[in-house]
Amino acid sequence: MNAAAKAGKLARAPADLGKGGVPGDAVPGAPVAAPLAKEIPEVLVDPRSRRQYVRGRFLGKGGFAKCFEISDADTKEVFAGKIVPKSLLLKPHQKEKMSMEISIHRSLAHQHVVGFHDFFEDSDFVFVVLELCRRRSLLELHKRRKALTEPEARYYLRQIVLGCQYLHRNQVIHRDLKLGNLFLNEDLEVKIGDFGLATKVEYEGERKKTLCGTPNYIAPEVLSKKGHSFEVDVWSIGCIMYTLLVGKPPFETSCLKETYLRIKKNEYSIPKHINPVAASLIQKMLQTDPTARPTIHELLNDEFFTSGYIPARLPITCLTIPPRFSIAPSSLDPSSRKPLKVLNKGVENPLPDRPREKEEPVVRETNEAIECHLSDLLQQLTSVNASKPSERGLVRQEEAEDPACIPIFWVSKWVDYSDKYGLGYQLCDNSVGVLFNDSTRLILYNDGDSLQYIERDGTESYLTVSSHPNSLMKKITLLNYFRNYMSEHLLKAGANITPREGDELARLPYLRTWFRTRSAIILHLSNGTVQINFFQDHTKLILCPLMAAVTYINEKRDFQTYRLSLLEEYGCCKELASRLRYARTMVDKLLSSRSASNRLKAS
C-alpha cells in the first residue's frame, strides 16, 4: 500500500498548521477555529507500533494544530509533535490534502529538509512526528535582525538551494518557500518544512494551475493562472534573498491587491548599498518570464556563491546580533585569533566581511536604532496597558502564548559593585560581563577564554584571557572576581562548554545601561532587550521590542512568552498586568534619559 493510501483515512488540516520550531507557517497564537473537543493526551500512542511519546512543552499553534515537544518513552529521543484534532477536519478535501502532504513529506530524506519520523491517529487526533528545530525559523531571525550581513545570507541561501535541488530532483515543487517555512536546528542548519502546498510533477512539462502560495513570495505565473512548475520555487528564493539582504520583501505593501499588482508588473527596487553581484542574482531569479530564470541546479554556480565568503558555521549569537567577520576567512579559527583585534571603530561604521568587500548593513546598533527600539517598546506597552487586559469578563491568557518569541539572551544573574567597580552579570549562555563605572564593558565568553571589550566610544575588540595587553589586566582581574563570586554565591557550577565550529564569529549583546528602584533592577541590553527583575517576589519580565513580546517568569520560575498584541486581545492576569504597567514607566525612563550609555539615576 502506498503512502497516500495509508494516509487516506486521515483528516487533513490546512497548509498553515502550527509553527514554533515545527513545519507549518500559521501565526502562533492565532484564534482556533473551534474549541478542542477532547483534551490532548499526556502520552501519545502509535496503535500500530505501540511506540509511546511523552508530551512535553508547548511549541506553538495554528488554526487547526497545536505543536509540542515530544519524546520517545523508550529512547528519550526528542521530536516535534504536530497534533490535529479530527473534530476540526471533517471536509473531504482536507483529508485529501493531508494525505498528499504526508505522502510527499515522508518520501523525503535530506540534510536540509525537516525530517519526517512518523504519523498515526487515535479516535480524536492525528499525530505527525517531525524533526525538532529548536532555533525556530528564518522568520524569527528576520524579525530580530532585519537585514543580514552578506556572508550570513550566502550561508543560509546555499542550504536553501541544496534542499530545493533535492526536492526538484525528486519531482517535488514546494510552492510555499518563505522565511517561516525555513527552520533552523541547534547548529543553525536550514531545514525546509511545511509541505502543505507541495505538489509532485507527474510527467515532463506538466504545468500546475492551483492558485497557492504566500502573497509576498508568490510568482507572477501563479497569479496569472497560466500554469506553473519548478520555476516558482526559484522566484521564491529570489524573494527570500532580497529579504535577507535588504530587510524586507521586494513587493511588500500594506495592501494585498497592491502587492499582487507589483508582482505582476515586476515592480521592485534594489537599494544601492547591495553588492552588484548579489543584485544581479536577485534580478535573474525575479524575472517575470519563468523560462528566463536560472534553474535551481544553476544557482550555486553564480558568482554570488563562487566568489564570496561562506562561513562553514554560524554562532547562535547571530540570531540576535551580527557575527564578526573581522579577519580574513583563511584565518577564521580560534587558534589564529589575534589579541585585541579591533572589529569596529565607532558605532556607525559597517562590519567588514573580508578584505576588498563592502558590507552592509551597519553592524552595531546605533544610539538612534536603540532609541527606536525603546520607542517601539513604549508604544507596544502603552497599547496593551490601554486595553486594560486584566479587566475582562473572560481572560484567556493562554491564547496569547507564543513560544516562537522566546528570547535568545537574558541576564540570569547579577551582582552590584557599582560603588567601587561596576555591575557584573551573567547571560543565560553562561558568559559573564561587567559594565564598569567608566562606561567600558568586558565580556568573558562561555569557553572561559575568549573576551570581548567595548570601549566608551563603541569600539569592539577581541582578545583572550591568555593573550591580552597589560592595560586590561586590572579589568580582567575584576571580571574574574565577579565571575567567581557569582559561581560561588549565585550559580550552580556548570560543566565546561565545548567550543563549536562557528563560535569564533560570535559577538554577544552587552549590558548597555541599568538602574535600580526600590522595587526592581532594570537592565537594558544592546540587542534591544529590556529585563526587569522584581526584588520582592523574584518575578521577572524580559521584553523584546523586535518580537513585540514579553517573557514572564513567575514566583514558581515558570517561563512563559506572550505576544503583546495577543495579550491586548485575550487579556491577562492581574499580576502580569500590573508588571506591564510598571514596565511602561521604566521604559519611558530609559527613553527620556540622556545618560543612557551607563547607569541611570534611580528615582
Curated annotation (Swiss-Prot):
Keywords, comma-separated and alphabetical: ATP-binding, Cell cycle, Cell division, Centromere, Chromosome, Cytoplasm, Cytoskeleton, Isopeptide bond, Kinase, Kinetochore, Mitosis, Nucleotide-binding, Nucleus, Phosphoprotein, Repeat, Serine/threonine-protein kinase, Transferase, Ubl conjugation
Chain intervals for the UniProt region annotation (Important for interaction with phosphorylated proteins): 538-540
Record-level Gene Ontology MF annotations? anaphase-promoting complex binding; ATP binding; identical protein binding; magnesium ion binding; microtubule binding; protein kinase activity; protein kinase binding; protein serine kinase activity
Indicate the impact reported for K82M. Abolishes activity
Renumbered to this chain, region (Activation loop) spans 194-221
Motif D-box that targets the protein for proteasomal degradation in anaphase extends across 337-340
Annotated active site residues, numbered on this chain, are: D176
* Pfam families hit by this protein: Pkinase (PF00069), POLO_box (PF00659)
The reported result of mutating D194 to N/R is: Abolishes activity
**Is Cell division among this UniProt entry's keywords?**
yes
**Coiled coil, from the record:** none
Reactions mediated catalytically: L-seryl-[protein] + ATP = O-phospho-L-seryl-[protein] + ADP + H(+); L-threonyl-[protein] + ATP = O-phospho-L-threonyl-[protein] + ADP + H(+)
| First-tier enzyme category under EC | transferase
Q: Where is this region: Linker?
A: 493-507
SUPFAM superfamilies, per database record: Polo-box domain, Protein kinase-like (PK-like)
Q: Which residues form the Protein kinase domain?
A: 53-305
Q: Which Gene3D superfamilies match?
A: Phosphorylase Kinase, domain 1, POLO box domain, Transferase(Phosphotransferase) domain 1
**Which tissues is this protein detected in according to the database?**
Newborn and adult spleen, fetal and newborn kidney, liver, brain, thymus and adult bone marrow, thymus, ovary and testes.
An example GO BP is: protein localization to organelle
An annotated GO cellular component of this protein is: nucleus
| UniProt free text on domains | The POLO box domains act as phosphopeptide-binding module that recognizes and binds serine-[phosphothreonine/phosphoserine]-(proline/X) motifs. PLK1 recognizes and binds docking proteins that are already phosphorylated on these motifs, and then phosphorylates them. PLK1 can also create its own docking sites by mediating phosphorylation of serine-[phosphothreonine/phosphoserine]-(proline/X) motifs subsequently recognized by the POLO box domains.
Function, in words: Serine/threonine-protein kinase that performs several important functions throughout M phase of the cell cycle, including the regulation of centrosome maturation and spindle assembly, the removal of cohesins from chromosome arms, the inactivation of anaphase-promoting complex/cyclosome (APC/C) inhibitors, and the regulation of mitotic exit and cytokinesis. Polo-like kinase proteins act by binding and phosphorylating proteins that are already phosphorylated on a specific motif recognized by the POLO box domains.
This one is known as Serine/threonine-protein kinase PLK1
Q: Which gene encodes it?
A: Plk1
